[in-house]
Amino acid sequence: MLMNFVNNVSKTINGGARIVYVGSFSWAVLSLLFVTAFSGWNNIFSMLPHEIFILVLTISLPIALIVLIFMLSQIVRTVESVKSEISTLSQRDPVSEEAVTMLADLFREHRDAVAAQVAAQVEATAQLVQINQDNRALAAPSPDSGDENPLALLAQMFREYRETVTAQLEAQISATTQLVEASRDSRDGIVDELRSQRVLSQEITQELSHIAQSRNVVPVAEPGLDPSQRIDRMRALAEVLGLALNDLSMTATQLLSEHLNAAHGDREGTQKFISTLTNAYFAGDKNVFFRSLVSEVVNHSDQLQQCAIGAENVRQQISKILREAREIRSLVSACDPNDLVRIVFEDGELWALEKALAEHFLIDGTPISDA
């Protein structure tokens, strides 16, 4: 009786499996063709979440059914092989009780394994059906809500998430814009501060000429000058020299910018480099422009001379640096060697800049090689 039942099941599964295989495969292929023709694979991610889930479920159900039928077929084949073994053993030794007992145990173990596999498949199928029912319940309209749109709740959740992400992106863009504006304001303030020094250029030149002629403000150790008067004169000279050095820093910055733009042609890179030097200048390094210009004159004198030949303003800037540097050096050298003003200003970066420029340019800014 058991053998007849197994034979009937085997015939039923073998005949129906082919139909299920063909139907499931056709279902999957038609689903893929439908998506390709009417929706497009590029529009999948623009679908709502429940639509994507239904699409995946539609394609995966026939595949799962094919796998289930395949496993059932394997189980039936295994049972048939066991049946064949039992028949063979029965024919070989029909009177052996030990062989019959062993076959019964083997069949019992195999039946338990088959039952476990069938139970697992039934549980998996039940879970798949439950997921499908939950998805349908989610897509179905609520009778108590009165909402005409069955996907209103899901659409509202998706809309709130999108608005949250948009708000975060707008906050980041606003913070970045504020940072850029703050950097631009800081840079504009530095440029305005440097430009304001140009207003004093003519007055400083006249003051230096007057001081060089009179020499009365130089704190020479004269008899009859008390320490307070000597300190006042040194302070006055230091203030004049400080204004002159600020003006020279502005001129050196302009000359350095003209030279770098002509040599490299990268205005953005030049602006970044000048901004770095400006930050160092306002941080306390008052000689940073002189030191950078000395390096360019020493290492790229040919390029600077070519720039001076083709640009009148470059020659004027070089001439201004040479004339003011010589006046400052003359004032400082007139001080007593032990005076603080001379100790601070003598043999500094400005001295090195004047020496480097004087080796390649005349007092009017004309290159020596072109004179």
From Swiss-Prot:
Outline the inducing conditions. Answer: Expressed in exponential phase, peaks about 18 hours. Protein is associated with magnetosomes as they start to develop, rises to a maximum quickly (at protein level). First gene in the 4 gene mamXY operon.
Q: What happens when the gene is disrupted?
A: Deletion of 4 consecutive genes (mamY, mamX, mamZ, ftsZm) leads to cells with an intermediate magnetic response where magnetosomes have short chains of nearly regularly shaped, cubo-octahedral crystals flanked by small particles with poorly defined morphologies.
Record GO terms (molecular function): lipid binding
- Which loops or segments lie on the Cytoplasmic side of the membrane, by the record? 1-18, 73-371
Q: Where in the cell is it found?
A: Magnetosome membrane
Lumenal membrane side: 40-51
The record describes its membrane topology as: Multi-pass membrane protein
* Complex formation: Probably interacts with MamX and MamZ proteins.
Please state which protein family the record places this protein in.
Belongs to the magnetosome MamY family.
The protein's name: Liposome tubulation protein MamY
Q: Which organism is it from?
A: Magnetospirillum gryphiswaldense (strain DSM 6361 / JCM 21280 / NBRC 15271 / MSR-1)
